[in-house]
Swiss-Prot record:
Catalytic activity: D-ribulose 5-phosphate = (2S)-2-hydroxy-3-oxobutyl phosphate + formate + H(+); GTP + 4 H2O = 2,5-diamino-6-hydroxy-4-(5-phosphoribosylamino)-pyrimidine + formate + 2 phosphate + 3 H(+)
Protein name: Riboflavin biosynthesis protein RibBA
UniProt-annotated binding residues for GTP: R250, V251, H252, S253, E254, Q271, E293, G294, R295, T315, T350, K355
Keywords: GTP-binding, Hydrolase, Lyase, Magnesium, Manganese, Metal-binding, Multifunctional enzyme, Nucleotide-binding, Riboflavin biosynthesis, Zinc
Active site, per annotation: D327 (proton acceptor), R329 (nucleophile)
Residues carrying the site annotation Essential for DHBP synthase activity: H124, E162
Binding-site list for Zn(2+): C255, C266, C268
Molecular-function annotations in GO: 3,4-dihydroxy-2-butanone-4-phosphate synthase activity; GTP binding; GTP cyclohydrolase II activity; magnesium ion binding; manganese ion binding; zinc ion binding
Family to which the UniProt record says this protein belongs: In the N-terminal section; belongs to the DHBP synthase family. In the C-terminal section; belongs to the GTP cyclohydrolase II family.
Disulfide bonds: none
UniProt-listed Enzyme Commission number(s): 4.1.99.12, 3.5.4.25
Cofactor binding mode and count: Binds 2 divalent metal cations per subunit. Magnesium or manganese. Binds 1 zinc ion per subunit.
Needed co-factor(s): Mg(2+); Mn(2+); Zn(2+)
C-alpha cells in the first residue's frame, strides 16, 4: 500500500512531490511534500490546486535565526505545538500570493545571503521550525519534511501542503491512496520514516566502561547515552562475547518498584536477579538494562496505572485509560547497543514474543528464546495472567 522510503527519496531528488501520512492517532492526515531547494511555480500550483491546504515551509532553527523569524504567537496552544513563525513574502514580490511569487519567497529563504530585512511580514509563506532530532523527537510533517531533505543531501527545508478532499473534508488514507494513484506519486508514512532513520543512523554512544562486582558475579559494565531522548542505559557483559557464537542476552526494562523495592505487583525484580545468575552460570552473556520504566510510560504514570489497577482495571486497561498503548517500549536503541557490542546472534531470555520481533527488526537474529518464568505470587497473579491474555506473553500459569 505504501512505498519504501528509498523510493520517495529518489523522487524528491528529482524535484517530484511525495505524499506523507502521519499516525491515525495523531492528525491522521496526508501532506504533499517537496524539497524547498527544488521548488518551482509549477509545484506550488500543483499543491494549492490539488492539496488545497496551507503552503508551509519547514526549516531548521538555524534558518529561523538567520532570517529573524519570530514565533507567530507568544503562547502556543496548538495541540501538537506546531511551530509557526510569522508569515513572510520576499521584498521583490508584489502581492506575494501567486505560485510564482511564493516559489520566489521560498527560494530566497534558502539564499545564504538573505537576511530578515529581505522579507515583508506578514506574508503568504508560512515557515515552520522543525524540532532538532526530526521525527525521532516529534512525529510531525514539519520534521518529516526537513528529515527527508537532509536524507536527500539537500538544504534542510521542505515545502508542505495539507491534502483536502474536493468536498472540504480532510483526506484520509483511502483518499490519499487514490490521489497517489491518480498523479503517480509515491506515498510513505512518518512511522516508516522513523523506522528508516533508526535503522540507518547511530543514535547511541559508548560513554564509560568499568568492572562491576555484584552479588551474582563480576561483570564488565558499559554505560551508553543516546541522542534520541538523552536517557542513559547500561550493559553488563560477562565473558568473551566476540566469538561469533550465539550469546545469552536479557533486555531488561527498568522497574524501580520491582528491581529496587522488591514490589510483589510484578515479577521484574526476580527476573532481573535470575537473568544475572543465569548469565553468570553460563560464563558468557549480556544483560542490557534499559531506562524504560513502566513499559515506557515513566515512573509516575506507572504509579497512576497501579492506582487504576486498585480500582479494578488490569495493567493493559490502566495504560489505555491514561492514554498510552499497552506497551510503549522501543527496542531500536537497545538493538543499537547490542550491535555496538558486536552481537549478531542471540539466545534471548524472554517470555515476550514482541521483544523478539522488536530486536529482529534491527538485523539481530534470535536463535533461541530462553524462558525466564518466575513463580507467581498472590499479588501478581492477575497481572501475569493479563500479560498472557492481552500481551501474548509465553507463561505457564
Amino acid at each position: 500500500m505504501f512505498h519504501r522510503i528509498e523510493e520517495a527519496l529518489e523522487d524528491l531528488k528529482q524535484g517530484k512531490v511525495v505524499i506523507v501520512c502521519d499516525d491515525e492517532n495523531r492528525e491522521n492526515e496526508g501532506d504533499f511534500i517537496a524539497l524547498a531547494e527544488y521548488i518551482t511555480p509549477e509545484t506550488i500550483n500543483f499543491m494549492i490546486t490539488h492539496g488545497r491546504g496551507l503552503v508551509c515551509v519547514p526549516i531548521t532553527e538555524g534558518y529561523a535565526e538567520r532570517l529573524q523569524l519570530e514565533p507567530m504567537v507568544a503562547h502556543n496552544t496548538d495541540s501538537h505545538h506546531t511551530a509557526f513563525t510569522v508569515s513572510i513574502d520576499h521584498v521583490s514580490t508584489t502581492t506575494g500570493i501567486s505560485a510564482h511569487e511564493r516559489a520566489t519567497t521560498i527560494r530566497e529563504m534558502l539564499n545564504p545571503a538573505s537576511k530578515g530585512a529581505d522579507f515583508n511580514r506578514p506574508g503568504h509563506i508560512f515557515p515552520l521550525i522543525a524540532k532538532e532530532g526530526g521525527v525521532l523527537r516529534r512525529a510531525g510533517h514539519t520534521e518529516a519534511a526537513v528529515d527527508l531533505a537532509q536524507l536527500c543531501g539537500a538544504e534542510p527545508a521542505g515545502v508542505i501542503c495539507e491534502i483536502i478532499n474536493e468536498d472540504g473534508t480532510m483526506a484520509r488514507v483511502p483518499d490519499l491512496l487514490q490521489c497517489a494513484k491518480q498523479f503517480d506519486i509515491k506515498m510513505i508514512t512518518i512511522e516508516d520514516l522513523i523506522a528508516y532513520r533508526r535503522h540507518h543512523e547511530t543514535l547511541v554512544t559508548r560513554e564509560v566502561e568499568i568492572t562491576l562486582p555484584t552479588d551474582f558475579g563480576t561483570f564488565h559494565a558499559i554505560g551508553y547515552s543516546n541522542s534520541l531522548d538523552s536517557k542513559e542505559h547500561i550493559a553488563l557483559v560477562k565473558g568473551d562475547i566476540s566469538t561469533g557464537d550465539p550469546v545469552l542476552v536479557r533486555v531488561h526494562s527498568e522497574c524501580l518498584t520491582g528491581d529496587v523495592f522488591g514490589s510483589c505487583r510484578c515479577d521484574c525484580g526476580p527476573q532481573l536477579h535470575a537473568a544475572l545468575a543465569q548469565i553468570e552460570r553460563e560464563g558468557k552473556g549480556v544483560l542490557l538494562y534499559m531506562r524504560q520504566e513502566g513499559r515506557g510510560i515513566g515512573l509516575l504514570n506507572k504509579l497512576r496505572a497501579y492506582k487504576l489497577q486498585e480500582e479494578g482495571f488490569d495493567t493493559v486497561e490502566a495504560n489505555e485509560k491514561l492514554g498510552f498503548p499497552a506497551d510503549l517500549r522501543d527496542y531500536g536503541i537497545g538493538a543499537q547497543i547490542l550491535k555496538d557490542l558486536g552481537l549478531q546472534h542471540l539466545r534471548l531470555l524472554t517470555n515476550n514474543p514482541r521483544k523478539i520481533a522488536g530486536l529482529q527488526g534491527y538485523d539481530l537474529e534470535v536463535i533461541e528464546r530462553v524462558p525466564l518464568q518466575m513463580p507467581a505470587k498472590e499479588e501478581n497473579k492477575t497481572y501475569l495472567q493479563t500479560k498472557v491474555n492481552k500481551l501474548g506473553h509465553l507463561l505457564n500459569l
